[in-house]
């Protein structure tokens, strides 16, 4: 006879019903059924607390971090300066023409999600998605004011009283305050945070600031406090996308019914009567803690965000009963299928725990458990390779880029001017981009067309081939440049010429190959 483990404690059954069970499904546009998730305790809940604290801390505090870039640049560590068209990230400064770096980061983010999903399933949804993080934060407030699951259910079902009004007003007021803080933190990324905060308090900030805060306050309050799981189930496309990205070796939260079935609320009596029972005592703890209101025992479901709180709840019950943890666990579908085949004799019989346990109650050697090496399979490595390649490419581009650029635009009307002595002059609009927060002296040189001379409007003439120009820090300096080729030397224009901008101190340089237009048949 299969050995039955000693029961250390009795486990009560929680009154919890899933929102998506077939027996409770109503019309397509049914009124939302409130979910009152019970607080869970365990390793995954602690990890979620850590992720929540880190992500919220980064979001709310980052705009207030200072970073000294000198006297000619803002000192906010992370700043999206739309007015100056700059993006600052600590020691990195991105100009508009370098937006491909931002595009590269978006590509990395996309492949990062593919990588995480392929390796560990919907971990993004369960731990780091903003919707998940803010819902967790709102639930902390709700539990603090109204109590845990049973107390909240009683309060919701009870009649209106002064105590109920007090608790509801306090809860919603804090939720609105969180929404205001969320909207305020967002706009601080687009302006100097201390200055904008002073303007907001003094009520003289730009209207767009108040509008943005209002919109984000409303969305945070509605999504995090009122809609919650409905955002994930009905509004977010990511569950549908991820469904196509998972395979039989992806980690998903799984109810191991090969050891849990048949369920029994009275395992001792059933065993004494010779009945076959599994480890699940049908306590509904996994349903009570689920923020999505589902029963993981019903199998893989679109609503499951793999937050693993049901694992913590079930592990706690197994500890009380003196049984092995892992009745609900992270597992791969391939391992699950193999264990189910073992428990059902290849699918030809009902689940029998004696097929997966020996006479002493221990799991048989054929039972497959999670092997973390499955994470490093070819599909995951390919995603990681693409992700790392893009990352190294961006890093190399950032380290190797010059902070001096030369942009040249040839005059179109007129394309050339014939002077009284027969020489031909072409005009060019030149822009020098000094992409560091320091003033520099740039040497602008013409190379090629040996007989040609160059003149820069408003600048000292120099030797006719080279002009020294002072450029402001972190600015674009526009210049009007005229290049003149004397009569009799027009043949030199066939090869054109080069404009070279160079910083003698850092030896940074940029070169532009320009054409020189001539009148008549000689022009090009």
Swiss-Prot record:
GO cellular component entries: plasma membrane
Main location: membrane
Binding-site positions, [4Fe-4S] cluster: 280, 283, 286, 290, 304, 307, 310, 314
Keywords: 4Fe-4S, Cell membrane, Electron transport, Iron, Iron-sulfur, Membrane, Metal-binding, Nitrogen fixation, Plasmid, Transmembrane, Transmembrane helix, Transport
Disulfide bond sites: none
Pfam families: Fer4_18, Fer4_5, FixG_C
Transmembrane intervals: 99-119, 173-193, 207-227, 380-400
Domain 4Fe-4S ferredoxin-type: from-to ranges: 272-299
InterPro entries, A to Z: 4Fe4S_Fe-S-bd (IPR017896), 4Fe4S_Fe_S_CS (IPR017900), Cyt_c_oxidase_cbb3_FixG (IPR014116), Electron_Trans/Redox (IPR051684), FixG_C (IPR032879), Helical_ferredxn (IPR009051), Ig-like_fold (IPR013783)
Membrane topology recorded in Swiss-Prot or TrEMBL: Multi-pass membrane protein
Keyword Transmembrane belongs to the record: yes
Protein localization: Cell membrane
Role summary: FixG is predicted to be involved in a redox process. The four proteins FixG, FixH, FixI, and FixS may participate in a membrane-bound complex coupling the FixI cation pump with a redox process catalyzed by FixG.
Protein name listed in UniProt: Nitrogen fixation protein FixG
Species: Rhizobium meliloti (strain 1021) (Ensifer meliloti)
């Amino acid at each position: 006879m299969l050995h039955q483990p000693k029961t250390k404690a009795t486990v009560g059954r929680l009154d919890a019903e899933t929102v998506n069970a077939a027996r409770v499904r109503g019309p397509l546009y049914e009124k939302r059924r409130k979910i009152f998730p019970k607080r869970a305790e365990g390793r995954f809940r602690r990890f979620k607390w850590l992720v929540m604290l880190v992500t919220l801390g980064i979001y709310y505090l980052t705009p207030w971090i200072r970073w000294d870039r000198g006297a000619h640049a803002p000192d906010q560590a992370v700043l999206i300066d739309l007015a100056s068209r700059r993006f600052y990230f600590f020691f990195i400064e991105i100009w508009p023409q370098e937006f491909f770096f931002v595009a590269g980061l978006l590509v990395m983010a996309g492949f990062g999600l593919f990588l995480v999903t392929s390796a560990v399933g919907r971990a993004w949804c369960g731990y780091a998605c903003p919707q998940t993080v803010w819902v967790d934060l709102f639930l902390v407030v709700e539990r603090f004011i109204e109590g845990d699951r049973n107390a909240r259910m009683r309060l919701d079902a009870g009649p209106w009283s002064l105590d109920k009004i007090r608790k509801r007003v306090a809860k919603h007021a804090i939720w609105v305050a969180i929404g205001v803080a969320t909207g305020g933190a967002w706009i601080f990324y687009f302006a100097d945070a201390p200055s904008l905060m002073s303007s907001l308090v003094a009520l003289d900030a730009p209207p767009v600031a108040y509008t943005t805060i209002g919109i984000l306050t409303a969305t945070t309050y509605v999504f995090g406090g009122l809609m919650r799981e409905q955002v994930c189930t009905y509004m977010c496309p990511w569950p549908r996308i991820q469904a196509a990205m998972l395979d039989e070796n992806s980690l998903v939260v799984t109810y191991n019914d090969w050891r849990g079935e048949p369920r029994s609320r009275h395992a001792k009596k059933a065993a004494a009567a010779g009945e076959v029972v599994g480890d699940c005592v049908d306590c509904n703890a996994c349903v009570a803690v689920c923020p999505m209101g589902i029963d993981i025992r019903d199998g893989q479901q679109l609503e499951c965000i793999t937050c693993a709180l049901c694992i913590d709840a079930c592990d706690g019950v197994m500890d009380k009963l003196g049984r092995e943890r892992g009745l609900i666990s992270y597992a791969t579908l391939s391992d699950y299928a193999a264990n189910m085949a073992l428990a059902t004799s290849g699918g030809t019989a009902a689940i029998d725990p004696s097929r997966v346990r020996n006479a002493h109650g221990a799991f048989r050697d054929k039972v497959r458990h999670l092997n973390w090496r499955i994470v490093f399979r070819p599909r995951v490595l390919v995603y990681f390779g693409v992700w790392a390649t893009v990352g190294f490419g961006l890093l190399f581009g950032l380290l190797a880029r010059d902070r001096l650029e030369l942009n040249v635009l040839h005059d179109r009307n007129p394309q050339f001017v014939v002077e009284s002595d027969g020489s031909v002059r072409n005009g060019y609009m030149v822009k020098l981009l000094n992409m560091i927060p320091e003033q520099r002296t740039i040497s602008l040189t013409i190379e090629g067309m040996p007989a040609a001379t160059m003149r820069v409007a408003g600048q000292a003439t120099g030797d006719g081939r080279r002009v020294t120009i002072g450029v402001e820090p972190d600015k674009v300096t526009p210049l009007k440049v005229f290049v003149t080729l004397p009569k009799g030397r027009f043949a030199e224009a066939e090869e054109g010429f080069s404009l070279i901008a160079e910083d003698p101190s850092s030896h940074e340089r940029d070169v532009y190959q320009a054409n020189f237009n001539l009148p008549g048949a000689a022009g090009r």
